[in-house]
A protein has these predicted regions:
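N-terminal entry/capping and adjacent linker segments that precede and initiate structured domains
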Residues: 1-314
Length: 314
């Protein structure tokens, strides 16, 4: 009597309830399991969603320490100096070059750009990776000006936006990648003066600071007209010095700002109502030693415990 085989969708559903460590062990069970876990981006999204619903997600900061060498830091650790909170990561594919840019991440999927515009998407938890085609810029040595990554749940599609500068013809070239179509679309980006490389994803849009003390936004749901729009900063916003855009509590744009008049202080603002300038609210001030006034900084807020953590990187 033949044993009844479980349908593929039932197996995938069961696997989504397993933690990542167990999933990695299951890749050795069979080629079928290995293919589902490591090669199916839809399974990765389902597993991520299940972990988020169960509130078992790990919140980790991914960073590059030396070219294509990566580490991740557990943001829930009591002390950032604890070596047990750091995990060394290894690329599951040969690194195309020693120069790499971390374009961004979304739902545990990381997007990388190597020299000569070689792009990859990578899931550090499962080892899944996929090479992305060249965006079609006129020259492969163009410098990346700004970039970011977002995910559209209704379309089940990851989008990557990159803008590079053609140093010969002095013009910007932009392109947006769709993981669903596995292709790029070009867009106009000549009028922009973005001052922050890495963007911020919120409300299905990407956001950057520009040189005019405004936030430039790009709606990822656009189908035909790929246009940028601008949002105003707080009316009380002082002279721009060091600033960065982030997300507070998963639903509000935030702004960390170091005014020149008070170089030993960081002001954190929150836009309570998206797109409404008058909804900007000053959340708190953070004072620190003046020697750190020229640091790059990122804000992390743990809303579950109501703790705010501000990290400065020299």
């Amino acid at each position: 009597m033949e044993k009844a085989a479980l349908p593929e969708e039932i197996i995938e559903h069961i696997l989504t309830f397993l933690p990542v460590k167990s999933l990695i062990r299951f890749t050795c069970v069979s080629k079928r399991f290995r293919s589902i876990i490591l090669s199916d981006p839809k399974f990765a999204q389902s597993q991520f969603q299940a972990a988020r619903d169960r509130k078992t997600l790990d919140h980790r900061l991914l960073y590059s320490i030396d070219g294509p060498r990566f580490e991740s830091l557990d943001l829930k650790t009591p002390s950032f100096g604890d070596p047990s909170s750091v995990r060394k990561l290894k690329l599951p594919f040969p690194s195309p070059s020693s120069a790499v840019v971390l374009l961004g991440s979304c739902n545990g999927i990381v997007f990388l750009a190597f020299a000569e515009k070689i792009f990859y998407m990578w899931n550090p938890s499962t080892g899944f990776f996929k090479k992305i085609p060249h965006p079609g810029f006129s020259r492969i040595d163009n410098e990346l000006l700004f970039y970011d990554v977002g995910y559209l749940p209704a379309a089940d599609d990851y989008r990557v936006l990159v803008v590079s500068m053609d140093c010969i013809d002095i013009k910007n070239e932009g392109a947006i990648y769709s993981s669903k179509a596995h292709a790029w679309k070009t867009l106009e980006a000549d009028v922009l003066s973005i001052i922050s490389y890495q963007g911020t994803f919120l409300k299905e849009a990407l956001h950057w600071l520009d040189a005019q003390d405004e936030i430039v936004a790009f709606d990822l749901t656009q189908q035909e007209e790929h246009k940028f729009r601008k949002m105003l900063l707080p009316r009380a916003f002082e002279d721009r010095n060091f600033s960065s855009v982030g997300v507070f509590a998963g639903e509000c744009l935030s702004l960390a700002h170091c005014p020149m008049a008070a170089a030993d202080c960081i002001l954190v603002w929150v836009m309570r109502e998206y797109g409404v300038r008058d909804s900007w609210t000053k959340l708190f001030n953070l004072n620190f030693n003046s020697w750190t006034s020229h640091c790059l900084y990122t804000c992390y807020c743990n809303t579950e415990s109501s703790n705010g953590i501000l990290s400065c990187y020299v």
